[in-house]
UniProtKB/Swiss-Prot annotation:
Matching Pfam families: RNase_P_Rpp14
Keywords: Cytoplasm, Endonuclease, Hydrolase, Nuclease, tRNA processing
Function statement: Part of ribonuclease P, a protein complex that generates mature tRNA molecules by cleaving their 5'-ends.
Annotated disulfide bonds: none
Source organism (scientific name): Methanobrevibacter smithii (strain ATCC 35061 / DSM 861 / OCM 144 / PS)
UniProt GO BP: tRNA 5'-leader removal
Protein name, entry field: Ribonuclease P protein component 2
Amino acid sequence: MKLKVLPPTLRKNNRYLALDIKVKSVISKDDLVNIVWNGCIRFFGENGTGNFSLWVMKFYELEKTDEYNHYQAILRCQREYVDEVRASLALIYKHNRKDISVSTIGLSGTIKACQKFIEK
């Protein structure tokens, strides 16, 4: 039996956050997933974070210098929890005992529109 696709009116509405990440060590997309999830869990707990529907859609490695590595990413979350996700991302400051800065540089309803905030 084939499952039916949900019509657009019944789907959950997503928003896409463009993130700017500066860290003193090298990170991968998997590391960023752990950083984001751990930051949200510390601030809102597992029950609250489970509702966010977080997903790292794209990950860009921009620049490596002696002082820091510069990355940008697109993060998906549910529309109702955008403010909570932004608040928990602002509180992230350490990863593996290295300084890290995560800031939101843009918010959009589609991935294509969110990519205009990303420097390539």
